[in-house]
Design a protein with these regions (language model features):
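Active-site beta-loop-alpha junctions of metal-dependent nucleic acid enzymes
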Residues: 66-91
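Active-site-proximal, Lys/Arg-enriched surface segment
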Residues: 1-54, 58, 368-379
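An anionic, glycine-rich sequence signature occurring as long contiguous blocks
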Residues: 116-252
Length: 380
């Protein structure tokens, strides 16, 4: 599972529910200049609201949504929207893991999610002590591996993927290598129910032990020193690619959810320039995205059934409906009605049905089935 936030931008002229100014946030942002990705950042003010989305990356389905002002911190509704997603899939599925971005690096929040039995994949910030320790240990493990030795508590793994470029005689094949180092039981002092506080300096304080995956090389491109990606996880698996693949799914929410919602579903094209219009439109867009996924799954199952020779479509549904209800009768009395099997109606009418009586069906059994006491039935 993936959880992320995205802005639903508006303008200062929008009408809010309580008459207050449109929510806004001011910060530095790099202009969208593709020819110069290192353009100088400028101060901008963005108006609108923020959406919290829980996304299932394999089926590409939104599971929960929350909306609040754009200046609200990402952590504000992070747990609530995840809890809502768990309720929405209760009885059908279970959320086993969640991938988050650096905006959710909060010890209290992560500890609360972990208590629910959900595995967490989240990258550490470059200046964090836990990230610096993980990089240092990973480099030593890699150097020891080059000498044919191993470093205790570390696992070095590589994955090679062939990528074909071009076609025909000019086609070339490139091998992309991803190198990971898994570091087990790395101390993290801020990952607890209280977050970062003075208890960390206590002699009796025991930091949270996490597994970390350090990405030394990603698809053939080596990471710069001191800037290697460090993925923190509560997954006890020894293979570092478990955490790598789990976090890699987070990129799907940017393209298959946020971008598609804005570009293909016109998320920011609000039908009314008001807060209510923004909220209604957001829920409607993500509801439609979920319905489309459900329809595609239904069509896929129907196509496979048709290839096996099974009948599909409305004709089959009507036949099944007729088969399941051919021996039922509906009885009306004033403003009440009841649906009975034919033999039940006959028994209630004082008739005998030998075929069902041999199976143990009697008037008393029918009355008990519908919660009518036998004495009350005799008196009536």
């Amino acid at each position: 599972m993936v959880r992320d936030c995205t802005d639903d931008e508006a303008t200062p002229s929008y009408k809010t529910d309580d008459g207050r100014p449109v929510p806004h946030v001011t910060g530095e942002k790099r202009p969208d200049v593709r020819a110069n990705r290192h353009a100088k950042k400028v101060e901008v003010t963005v108006y609108g609201w923020k959406l919290w989305v829980v996304w299932e990356p394999q089926m590409k389905m939104p599971l929960a949504l929350a909306i609040d002002d754009i200046q609200v911190h990402d952590n504000q509704h992070a747990y609530e929207v995840l809890a809502q997603a768990q309720q929405n899939v209760a009885g059908i599925a279970r959320i086993r893991s969640v991938a988050l971005d650096r905006g959710f690096l909060d010890g209290k929040l992560l500890s609360r999610i972990e208590k629910d039995g959900i595995l967490i994949y989240i990258p550490a910030k470059a200046n964090m002590r836990v990230a610096q320790d993980a990089r240092e240990i990973a480099r030593r493990a890699w150097e020891e591996g080059q000498r044919g030795r191993s470093l205790e508590g570390c696992v070095v793994r590589e994955r090679h993927e062939k990528v074909r470029h071009g076609s025909g005689k000019k086609a070339t094949t490139e091998i992309l290598t991803t190198t990971l180092v898994g570091v087990r039981e790395l101390g993290c002092d801020w990952w607890n129910e209280d977050g970062s506080n003075s208890k960390e300096n206590s002699k009796s304080y025991e930091p949270k032990l996490l597994n970390a995956t350090v990405v030394l090389r990603w698809d053939g491109a080596p990471k710069e020193a001191e800037h290697e990606v460090v993925i923190l996880t509560t997954n006890p698996a020894q293979d570092p690619f478990e955490a790598f693949d789990g976090y890699d799914d987070r990129s799907l929410i940017e393209n298959t959810c946020n971008r598609e919602a804005k570009e293909q579903w016109f998320l920011e094209h609000h039908p009314k320039r008001s807060e209510a219009g923004v909220r209604v439109h957001a829920y409607f867009v993500f509801m439609c995205m979920a319905l489309v996924v459900g329809f595609r799954v239904h069509r896929s199952n129907s196509d496979r059934a048709r290839l096996r020779g099974q009948e599909t479509g409305i004709a089959r549904y009507r036949r099944e409906l007729r088969t399941n209800n051919w021996d039922k009768v509906m009885v009306f009395t004033e403003e009440h009605f009841g649906i009975f099997r034919n033999y039940e109606f006959a028994l209630l009418g004082g008739l005998s049905v030998l075929r069902n009586e041999r199976k143990g069906e009697s008037l008393a059994v029918v009355l008990e089935r519908y919660g009518v006491p036998a004495q009350r039935a005799d008196s009536s």
